[in-house]
Amino acid sequence: GLTGTIPKDEYEAVGCICSIGPVVGNLSSKELQDMGVLADLDINILQLQDGVLGFSSYAQELKWLVTDPKRIDQISNIVKGLSNSGNTLVLIDRIATGEMLMERNPDWVFISGEMKTTDRQKEYDEVSDANNKIIVATYGVAAVGINIPRIFNLVLLEPGKSFVRVIQSIGRGIRKASDKDYLQVIDLTSNLKYSKRHMSKRKEYYKEQNFRHTMTKVEYK
């Protein structure tokens, strides 16, 4: 196997090297962008103002963040606002989130591990010709090296603090196409305790990778 993302944690990095061998070369995403291999990008962190809710664990908080109906309505509106600027890939953690988004937007496509591989590939292939297609996919599916270069907008819903997940997720959209050399990334996060901590960690990764990023607080009802 091959990977372009070596984990930051030593025990994970050692496991990776034991499985596929030593690192044979090291080029950062910024270097590949400067060489014209990868698309340029901007990351817009949208911090939804979810009030002062308190949860005793990250799992409880995350469940609320990705299934609360009013929050899903807001997320749906944000994604729809991007649709006229090109194909959009929305990455989510829970199947329940995808189902809720599809209830509101039946013309979108939802891809999860439950979908047959051939059906998944058919949807990916359609992006080659489509212009305003919206694909919702779980992080687990997207982690398996999908190749869909004509993604112009990438939405990350509560991606957490895993270096590999965050960087690999961005990698799904940063590939160039004949009519694409720029990617807009929307990092959807919250002002709640655990989400806020994870967002701070992601900002460190963005800074390390020299990815331009800004943060905007978003009020909603």
What does each model-found stretch correspond to?
Residues 1-42, 206:
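Post-DEXD/H (motif II) to motif III coupling segment of the RecA-like Helicase ATP-binding lobe
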Residues 4-9, 31-38, 47-51, 96, ...:
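Conserved nucleotide-binding/hydrolysis micro-motifs of P-loop NTPases
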Residues 6, 153, 161-185, 202-203:
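Conserved SF2 helicase motif VI
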Residues 12, 20-23, 38-42, 149-153, ...:
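Short glycine-/polar-rich loops that comprise or flank the Walker A/P-loop
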Residues 52-104:
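Conserved interdomain hinge at the start of the Helicase C-terminal
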Residues 84-86, 131-132, 151:
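Short, high-confidence coil segments that cap the C-terminus of an alpha-helix
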Residues 89, 99-100, 108-143, 165:
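Conserved helicase ATPase core of P-loop NTP-dependent helicases/translocases
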Residues 177-221:
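C-terminal helicase lobe
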